[in-house]
Amino acid sequence: MMGFVKKIRDFFDLDEEKWEEDEYEQEEVAQQPKVEQKQNVVSLQSVQKSSKLVLFEPRAYAEVQEIADHLKNRRAVVVNVHRVDRDQARRIVDFLSGTVYAIGGDIQQVGSTIFLCTPDNVDVSGSISIVSDDEPTIKRW
């Protein structure tokens, strides 16, 4: 029987003396620096502090550029044009309409002579009825 086992060992090359154990060296793995990811968390207080609403009562068309500059700087503006004549008021509203269009904002009439101009970072919800039963009807813009 030993002959049979020896033949199998020789066939499969299972001779105990031929086996050498390989020596394994442990490789040092280079530590890669951790990539710090910036978190996409913004404090609500910082967002609220940076938002501003500016009120204007222009007395001349020349003031409209200052109003537009506030819109370009992403500030909402409420404009009351009651201090200028109707033609000047129309020019002011036309200029501001072009400005809010260019910056992707919005303009809404919230009173007979009051307009709310908002840049694209300000959302306005709700609506205000301009004409009520108590007020006399005024021609719309």
Swiss-Prot record:
GO terms for biological process: division septum assembly; FtsZ-dependent cytokinesis. It is found in: Cytoplasm. It comes from the Bacteria. One of its GO terms (cellular component) is cytoplasm. Keywords: Cell cycle, Cell division, Cytoplasm, Septation. HAMAP family: SepF (MF_01197). Homodimer. Interacts with FtsZ. Belongs to the SepF family. Cell division protein that is part of the divisome complex and is recruited early to the Z-ring. Probably stimulates Z-ring formation, perhaps through the cross-linking of FtsZ protofilaments. Its function overlaps with FtsA. This is Cell division protein SepF. It comes from Anoxybacillus flavithermus (strain DSM 21510 / WK1). The gene is sepF.
